[in-house]
């Protein structure tokens, strides 16, 4: 059995002469996202309004501010991942030497020519004037770099943040296209975790750091082809990710707050974006019945340990029709979790969080095509025991950094 499903999926896709490792060609394409968006009411948001930034600023009190500073590095594996992701922060578009990325200048071989990350080639490369061919090529390149799913859209103006999070300066981004890169958080681990134990943050930062790594390389590659490009990842965004995922055909908005759910990965992924002026053919939004499914399911709302997710109907909020979520409660739970590192219970229990097996592909197809089957899908999910942790194959160590020392937490399942 191939442990890495991406490799298996790519092999199957190549045998069918398809680009994508999942059967995205079977999805229903529509002209508009299934989430109603009133563009007249949507405004460009300041990234400093995010729950995590406000926690770090002290808006939720001194204790939460202190926990914000340690909620990722308090677990050694997620700490290592965020350290690596932090090295990518300056590699999005600005000219940066290797030393600034964390590698001492003395470690760079003298016989190698390291082009500045932000430099755009003076001449446009051959073959880059055909949008259809370049879209296919860019997707294939992203998959070669180990992406799990890729989509392309025109960059919505309202997806661009108004100001930088770091210094509050206005953002001026005029790229035409956005390339979205999804990375699976690993079904093998997701099956075993409770969703809010000690591996939770590491699953997130596995996908954050990997998608960011790919985005930085892809953006640099596009610049070498003669077109401006910027990577956007967890350590350095200039765009909001959800609207881009909607327009790039990578999912629909779900009940879990501002999360986009993919029909093949469920909510079990993180994304990075590359914006560019390279001419690209775009994808269209998709409709796989998720709005109807989430209206009936409500499992994430029932299981949410902080009560952040609503079981009520949708509301219009900042121009989007969406299910409401209490961002403050969610942020406090993820940062202040005393039983683990972070929280992803909503991802864990979601009926769309499944492996890519023939059985589960069949169930997914049925729920996409037959509305009456969706309620039975939720019932069957509970009947088969999905959403519960399987510690029989648990591989990670339960450890917590307290005052600089690694200790076994009281909530450890290692005992």
Protein language model annotation of sequence segments:
Residues 130, 134, 209, 213-214, ...:
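Intrinsic-disorder/low-complexity, polar/charged segments
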């Amino acid at each position: 059995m191939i442990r890495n499903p991406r490799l298996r999926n790519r092999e199957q896709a190549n045998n069918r002469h398809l680009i994508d490792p999942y059967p995205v060609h079977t999805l229903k394409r529509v002209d508009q996202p299934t989430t109603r968006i009133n563009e007249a009411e949507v405004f460009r948001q300041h990234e400093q309004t995010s729950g995590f930034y406000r926690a770090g600023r002290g808006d939720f009190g001194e204790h939460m501010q202190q926990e914000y500073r340690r909620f990722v590095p308090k677990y050694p594996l997620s700490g290592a991942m965020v350290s690596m992701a932090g090295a990518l922060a300056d590699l999005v578009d600005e000219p940066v030497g290797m030393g600034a990325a964390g590698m001492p200048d003395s470690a760079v071989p003298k016989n190698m020519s390291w082009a500045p990350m932000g430099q755009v080639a003076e001449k446009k490369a051959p073959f880059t004037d055909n949008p259809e061919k370049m879209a296919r090529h860019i997707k294939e390149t992203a998959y070669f770099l180990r992406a799990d799913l890729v989509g392309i859209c025109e960059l919505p103006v309202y997806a661009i943040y108004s100001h930088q999070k770091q210094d509050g300066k206005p953002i001026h981004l005029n790229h035409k296209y956005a390339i979205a890169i999804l990375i699976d958080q690993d079904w093998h681990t997701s099956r075993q975790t409770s969703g809010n134990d000690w591996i939770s943050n590491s699953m997130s930062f596995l996908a954050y750091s990997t998608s960011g790594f790919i985005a930085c390389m892809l953006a640099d590659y596009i610049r070498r082809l003669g077109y401006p490009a910027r990577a956007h990842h967890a350590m350095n965004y200039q765009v909001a990710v959800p609207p881009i995922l909607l327009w790039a055909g990578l999912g629909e908005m779900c009940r879990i707050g501002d999360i986009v759910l993919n029909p093949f990965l469920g909510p079990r992924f993180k994304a990075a974006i590359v914006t560019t002026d390279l001419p690209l053919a775009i994808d269209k939004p998709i409709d796989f019945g998720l709005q109807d499914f989430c209206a009936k399911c409500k499992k994430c709302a029932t299981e949410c340990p902080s009560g952040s997710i609503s079981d009520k109907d949708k509301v219009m909020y900042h121009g989007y029709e969406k299910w409401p979520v209490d961002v403050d409660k969610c942020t406090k739970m993820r940062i202040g979790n005393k039983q683990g590192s972070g929280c992803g219970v909503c991802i864990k229990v979601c009926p769309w969080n499944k492996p890519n097996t023939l059985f589960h592909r069949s169930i997914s197809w049925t729920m996409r095509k037959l509305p009456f089957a969706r309620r039975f899908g939720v019932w069957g999910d509970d009947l088969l025991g999905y959403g519960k942790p399987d510690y029989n194959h648990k591989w990670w160590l339960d450890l917590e950094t307290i005052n600089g020392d690694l200790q076994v937490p009281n909530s450890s399942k290692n005992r």
